[in-house]
Amino acid sequence: MKMDADSSGTQHRDSRGSRSRSRREREYHGRSSERDSRKKEHKIPYFADEVREQDRLRRLRQRAHQSTRRTRSRSRSQSSIRESRHRRHRQRSRSRNRSRSRSSERKRRQRSRSRSSERRRRQRSPHRYNPPPKIINYYVQVPPQDFYGMSGMQQSFGYQRLPRPPPFPPAPYRYRQRPPFIGVPRFGYRNAGRPPY
């Protein structure tokens, strides 16, 4: 692209050919009448601050383009028609099935299942329902006479208690004697060598 002093790059700015306009260009140049009509109807802004409101609208407009839905959206009326038709068909087939013998019905079901499984496999959503693993508690029995005396639970008649209460737990090894060296007391409230009064 040749650039002289006077040629601004506007003529041929897009290196990919003018096929793709930027979103901003599209917003400002395309469908002006539509935009004006949209501006005319007055909506109460979410933010009182103008700049924030503009920003919010722009973000909303951007988000409207990215959609994560893979299936084509269908109109409500269509889906309801289809559903009612489906229901009617099911009822009709059910009433017909009652008269038939069970075995032929079973055969037919197996045949149809084998045929339709390929079709169904693709339609199932990729995120299947995975329940969290169930935690099962098993209660282990402890012979109660051992258990009651030790844990200090309430003693009921009929359970033997231990002949004498368990001895005091031994002192930890380090302080069986006086600790070997006590540093200089820092004269704080807790550490002072004498009580604080």
Curated annotation (Swiss-Prot):
Effect on the protein upon substituting R94M: In strain: 14021-0231.6
Gene Ontology terms: cellular component: nuclear speck
Main location: nucleus
One of the record's GO molecular function terms: pre-mRNA binding
Location in the cell: Nucleus speckle
Compositionally biased intervals (Pro residues): 163-172
Pfam family, one: Transformer
Induction: Transformer protein is only present in females due to sex-specific alternative mRNA splicing of tra pre-mRNA. Female-specific alternative splicing of tra pre-mRNA is controlled by Sxl, which binds tightly to a characteristic uridine-rich polypyrimidine tract at the non-sex specific 3' splice site in one of the tra introns, preventing the general splicing factor U2AF from binding to this site and forcing it to bind to the female-specific 3' splice site. As consequence, only the female-specific transcripts are translated, while non-sex-specific RNA expressed in males is not translated.
Sequence ranges of Basic residues compositional bias: 58-75, 84-127
A GO BP annotation: female sex determination
InterPro entries in alphabetical order: Tra
Keywords: Differentiation, Nucleus, Sexual differentiation
Spans annotated as Disordered: 1-136, 158-197
Basic and acidic residues composition-biased segments: 1-17, 24-39
Protein task: Member of the regulatory pathway controlling female somatic sexual differentiation, regulated by Sxl. Activates dsx female-specific splicing by promoting the formation of a splicing enhancer complex which consists of tra, tra2 and sr proteins. Together with tra-2, plays a role in switching fru splicing from the male-specific pattern to the female-specific pattern through activation of the female-specific fru 5'-splice site. No known function in males.
Domain notes: RS domain directs localization of proteins to the speckled subnuclear compartment and the purpose of this localization is to allow colocalization and co-concentration of components of the splicing and splicing regulatory machinery to permit relatively high rates and/or efficiencies of reaction and interaction.
Name of the protein in question: Female-specific protein transformer
Taxonomic lineage from the root: Eukaryota, Metazoa, Ecdysozoa, Arthropoda, Hexapoda
Protein encoded by which gene: tra
